[in-house]
Amino acid sequence: MGQKVNPIGLRLGINRNWESRWFPSKATLPENIGEDYKIRKFLKTKLYYAGVSQILVERTAKKLRVTVVAARPGIIIGKKGGEIENLRSEVTKLVNKDIAINIKEERKAGSSAQLAAENVAMQLERRVAFRRAMKKVIQGAQKAGAKGIKVSVAGRLGGAEMARTEWYLEGRVPLHTLRARIDYGFAEAHTTYGNIGVKVWIFKGEVLQKGIQADKNEDTSPKKPRRARRGK
């Protein structure tokens, strides 16, 4: 189960929070979901090069607040905040509602699974070898303090005629452990050979109750790097 399901959805209410935070009524539920989708799709496309890792949508009775977490917030804000005002007006026109936009900096961009997946996808589109792109992202996550990372790419890798899946794993990524803080990201690389899917799982440690310590017998010593494996 843990191997198949989205690890973020599996941990909602345990150690992850929802990215859409509002209480719907039956009358407004479809409209609110549609608006959230439009806002996220627009901002992801418009701010792609700003390194957006997360978009939070909060609603109150009269206000809609959008929080954008990005690795390069300066691109979004612009000189003297001019760009963010233009962005707010564009999103307001999109959903016909008054919107407040907050920008937060992603302090540990190397340990963000979504940014790592987009980084690999961008390199694949630039014709970088997929193994080199995967190893580079793994090294960046380890430097940022990740306890484990798994990167998987699937498609016509290197222009091969038959599609296949290959992945690298460094450290531990316990997908079945619900208290484990697993970050997950997905991106697609649009190449001349077709689309290549990129998935990234990053293990950031375990969330334990107060007064409980992690198992001291657990082996935390560094292990030899594992070779790339081909999926079935």
Curated annotation (Swiss-Prot):
Q: Where is the composition biased (Basic residues)?
A: 223-232
rRNA-binding as UniProt keyword? yes
BP terms from Gene Ontology: translation
Domain KH type-2: residue ranges: 39-107
Q: Which Pfam families match?
A: KH_2, Ribosomal_S3_C
Q: What does this protein do?
A: Binds the lower part of the 30S subunit head. Binds mRNA in the 70S ribosome, positioning it for translation.
Self-association or partners: how does it assemble?
Answer: Part of the 30S ribosomal subunit. Forms a tight complex with proteins S10 and S14.
Q: Which UniProt keywords apply?
A: Ribonucleoprotein, Ribosomal protein, RNA-binding, rRNA-binding
What PANTHER family does the annotation carry? 30S/40S RIBOSOMAL PROTEIN S3 (PTHR11760), SMALL RIBOSOMAL SUBUNIT PROTEIN US3C (PTHR11760:SF19)
Family stated for the protein in its record: Belongs to the universal ribosomal protein uS3 family.
HAMAP family in the record: Ribosomal_uS3_B (MF_01309_B)
Q: Report the GO molecular function annotations.
A: mRNA binding; rRNA binding; structural constituent of ribosome
Which GO cellular component term is one of those annotated?
A: cytosolic small ribosomal subunit
Where is the sequence biased in composition, kind Basic and acidic residues? 213-222
The record's listing under InterPro entries reads: KH_dom, KH_dom-like_a/b, KH_dom_type_2, KH_sf_prok-type, Ribosomal_S3_C_sf, Ribosomal_uS3_bac-typ, Ribosomal_uS3_C, Ribosomal_uS3_CS
Instruction: State the encoding gene.
Output: rpsC
Name under which the protein is recorded: Small ribosomal subunit protein uS3
Tell me which SMART domains the record gives.
Answer: KH
The answer to keyword Membrane applying to this record is no
Q: Where is this region: Disordered?
A: 213-232
